[in-house]
Amino acid sequence: MIFTAPAYAPALPSPLPLQQTIGDFCLAKRRERQGASDSLFIEAAIDRKWTIDDIEARLGRMAAALSSAWNITPGQKWHKTVAILASNCVDTLILSWAVHRIGGGCLMLQPTSSADEMAAHMDRVPPFAMFLSQDLLTLGQEAFQKSSLSSNVPFYSFSGAEAPKPQQTAVPVASQDAPNISTLDDLMATGKELPLLEKTSFSEGEASRRVAYYCTTSGTSGFQRVVAITHENIIASILQAGLFIEATKGPASEVTLAFLPFNHIYGLLITHTFTWRGDSTVVHSGFNMMEILISIGKHRINTLYLVPPIINALSRNASILDRFDMSSVRYIVNGGGPLPKEAFLKMKAARPDWQIIPGWGQTEGCGIGSLSSPKDIFPGSSGVLLPGVRIRLRDDDGRIVQGLEEMGEIEIESPSGLFGYVDYADEALLSPPKEEEFWWPTGDVGLFRISPNGEQHLFIVDRIRDMIKVKGNQVAPGQIEDHLTKHAAVAETAVIGIADEVAGERALAFIVRESSHAREMSEADLRKIIQEHNDLELPEVCRLQDRIIFVDELPKSASGKILKRELRKQVATWSPPQK
């Protein structure tokens, strides 16, 4: 059985508009929608407003400066990549669009990755140049030193929206291979008098092959992978999300927040979609709860795009929200991971006037595969499929699931879907032929269920790699996690499987205690209470017994996903607590 978008979802244009680069595509639509004087971006830290004229002028000069500095002949098909390691700022977007205009692609490095991980990414996608925000210069230099890149790679720094603090100044690397660092402003100054380049016009099929971004997966269950994302992938995803939002919420533009990292596909995609929609976007360098809450009232933010850990934090600290002006907020959209029903209900209880809109997506699917309509919210689900997305489910025996309420691995087919992984020792770049159907196995386990409104909703059960096999039974960690968070003493939890001589595997829970309920209780007493809460109410295969570890925090990726691979490392030498 193949699942598709609901009847009310609009169709994608056919053929897709693939003549322009991503930035030019978004800016052209923006200019159609609103006047040039409207604020396209607002950088929160310095309260700087950017109009579309400002953006296009800087984009044109930056592309000309890059072309001149790197001796690129106008019209030449330049097929190189630059690496960008930066906190959120408008220049990060403009820089990537300028690189696209001269024919290049961008390797988006995540600051939460280790220097070793970034070095491995750069070895797989060797950059022609590196651009680093001031606060990440030292980390970028360390990653460079650990890579096999030659010392002639040019380095450029830029300050972003916030002036660099003294301690953010680059620390010289003690090596003869240490790079010389220029600034983006110096580069721009050289291009002030240069003639502007013509905008890129893709030939037929070129946008399907031309890589715009290399983004890394979160690596929640294993190592990070580098995904090649084309201009077609991004443009298709913008249209899928943007047209669905217009059909379900209306075409009116909004004021939105961009604090999710631009180097992660979720933050990158929604910011492009905001631009295409005509929204005004308030850019924050990262997530700081107090600064975000102030910004919501100051800029009258309408919709918050969040990840489950932030939603959990807001629901646990609902009293803090009352100290700020939240009257403009109408919607919160969840992405970056499934939002369990219990977390949904906690947030709804904290702010009953907010519509909570769950969604689902992956880096390999270029961001968003499903989303909810405000008129069809189904707690615990990840929404309905977006236009052009098709999903089938494959069960443990390799058969395609033929009905509702049956679990299977999600396989997806979409114009926004995977172009390829970059070469690994055991896996070559995968580039499926576009003229054939290509179903990508996502590694997520899901099922479909009918909502009260009669629509097919996708429910994410768990990651295949995270499923726990107890006495031959497949146990979803999410089932245990959802139940544990119902207990007042549990703030956050993550469940993994560990080896067991009798059952094969058993569940083990990492738990962050809720400070208002549990700090005064001993770990032994609290462990007993939580164990009884879980083991007396869930099936035997879900029992924890004494396999509970209390931690101050859970390791997370830049997008807020819990890194279970790090938790598995911690239990390599674990033994049950003494009784």
From Swiss-Prot:
GO MF terms held by the record: ATP binding; CoA-ligase activity
Listed EC numbers: 6.2.1.-
Entries under InterPro entries matching the protein: AMP-bd_C (IPR025110), AMP-bd_C_sf (IPR045851), AMP-dep_synth/lig_dom (IPR000873), ANL_N_sf (IPR042099)
SBD1: region residues: 288-358
Spans annotated as SBD2: 359-421
Residues bound to ATP: 217-225, 358-363, 444, 463, 561
Alphabetic keyword roster: ATP-binding, Ligase, Nucleotide-binding
Entry-linked Pfam families: AMP-binding, AMP-binding_C
Pathway membership: Secondary metabolite biosynthesis
Family that this chain belongs to: Belongs to the ATP-dependent AMP-binding enzyme family.
Purpose of the protein: Acyl-CoA ligase; part of the gene cluster that mediates the biosynthesis of the lipopeptides W493 A and B. W493 A and B consist of six amino acid residues D-allo-thr, L-Ala, D-Ala, L-Gln, D-Tyr, and L-Val/L-Ile linked to a 3-hydroxy-4-methyltetradecanoic acid polyketide chain. The biosynthesis starts with formation of the linear polyketide chain by the highly reducing polyketide synthase PKS40. The gene cluster contains a putative acyl-CoA ligase (FPSE_09184) for formation of a CoA thioester polyketide.
Swiss-Prot/TrEMBL domain comment: Both substrate-binding domains (SBD1 and SBD2) are involved in the substrate recognition, and are sufficient to confer the substrate specificity.
Record-given protein name: Acyl-CoA ligase FPSE_09184
Organism: Fusarium pseudograminearum (strain CS3096)
UniProt lineage: Eukaryota, Fungi, Dikarya, Ascomycota, Pezizomycotina
